[in-house]
């Protein structure tokens, strides 16, 4: 283990160089207001009872996706989308595309496209009479995703 390759510090990816775009009803928006974002996928599974074993197995039966982020409170894109639903009953799923690339890292670029996105709730109005900046927490779900660009495998991974 003493001679095992180690990751170079510069290969850690800085999140400050990320890009995030949202496409709603054919309109693509640069969501530069987001300063924190995370998406995850969870495997749904069912218990499998097996005769002759004391343990219970698991069988994958599907998956679900969720996302969350924090943004500066200075855009109305999602509120307009939600208002359309409130007035018409039509909620159009949207796409969120996130790319990570740090020019100082040899990891390169990774892009994840989330499709079938919905928002769980929306802040409609907000103020704070203090001197703090306004922000908003966003969260929702997605039902599809793709990875059109992948990080390069770092030297020593194989």
Name every feature range the model reports, one short phrase each.
Residues 83-89, 133-135, 153-158:
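Short intrinsically disordered coil segments
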Residues 141-144, 158:
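Short, surface-exposed polybasic-and-hydrophobic patches located at secondary-structure transitions
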Residues 1-5, 149-158:
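Intrinsically disordered, low-complexity terminal/linker regions enriched in Pro/Ser/Gly
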């Amino acid at each position: 283990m003493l001679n095992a390759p180690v990751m170079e510090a510069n290969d850690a990816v800085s999140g400050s160089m990320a890009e995030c775009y949202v496409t709603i009803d054919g309109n693509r928006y640069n969501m530069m207001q987001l300063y924190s974002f995370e998406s995850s996928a969870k495997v749904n599974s069912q218990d499998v009872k097996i005769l002759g074993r004391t343990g219970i197995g698991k069988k994958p039966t599907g998956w679900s996706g969720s996302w969350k982020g924090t943004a500066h409170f200075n855009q109305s894109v999602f509120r307009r989308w939600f208002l359309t639903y409130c007035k018409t009953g039509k909620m159009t799923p949207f796409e969120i595309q996130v790319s990570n690339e740090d020019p100082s890292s040899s990891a390169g670029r990774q892009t994840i496209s989330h499709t079938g996105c919905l928002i769980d709730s929306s802040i409609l109005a907000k103020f704070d009479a203090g001197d703090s900046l306004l922000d908003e927490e966003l969260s929702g779900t997605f039902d599809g995703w793709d990875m059109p660009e992948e990080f390069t495998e770092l030297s020593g991974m194989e």
